[in-house]
Amino acid sequence: MTQSNPNEQNVELNRTSLYWGLLLIFVLAVLFSNYSFN
């Protein structure tokens, strides 16, 4: 019944969302570079 677990879960959720955000930006950058080179 400690309140440290929800905080840790929130941190993990933030890290996961940040990771997927960076991955999405990377994929969009690759697609944009492919379109610009073509």
From Swiss-Prot:
Assigned keywords, A-Z: Chloroplast, Membrane, Photosynthesis, Photosystem II, Plastid, Reaction center, Thylakoid, Transmembrane, Transmembrane helix
* Location(s), subcellular: Plastid, Chloroplast thylakoid membrane
Sorted alphabetically, the Gene Ontology cellular component annotations on this record are: chloroplast thylakoid membrane; photosystem II reaction center
The coiled-coil regions, if any, are: none
Q: Could you list the residue ranges that cross the membrane?
A: 17-37
Asked whether the UniProt record includes Membrane among its keywords, one would answer yes
Q: Do the record's keywords include Transmembrane?
A: yes
| Signal sequence residues | none
A biological process from GO = photosynthesis
Q: How does it sit in the membrane?
A: Single-pass membrane protein
Q: Which SUPFAM superfamilies match?
A: Photosystem II reaction center protein L, PsbL
Describe its assembly: PSII is composed of 1 copy each of membrane proteins PsbA, PsbB, PsbC, PsbD, PsbE, PsbF, PsbH, PsbI, PsbJ, PsbK, PsbL, PsbM, PsbT, PsbX, PsbY, PsbZ, Psb30/Ycf12, at least 3 peripheral proteins of the oxygen-evolving complex and a large number of cofactors. It forms dimeric complexes.
HAMAP family xref list: PSII_PsbL
Task: Identify its protein family.
Answer: Belongs to the PsbL family.
**Function according to Swiss-Prot or TrEMBL:** One of the components of the core complex of photosystem II (PSII). PSII is a light-driven water:plastoquinone oxidoreductase that uses light energy to abstract electrons from H(2)O, generating O(2) and a proton gradient subsequently used for ATP formation. It consists of a core antenna complex that captures photons, and an electron transfer chain that converts photonic excitation into a charge separation. This subunit is found at the monomer-monomer interface and is required for correct PSII assembly and/or dimerization.
Q: What is this protein called?
A: Photosystem II reaction center protein L
Biological source species? Cycas taitungensis
What is the taxonomic lineage of the source species? Eukaryota, Viridiplantae, Streptophyta, Embryophyta, Tracheophyta
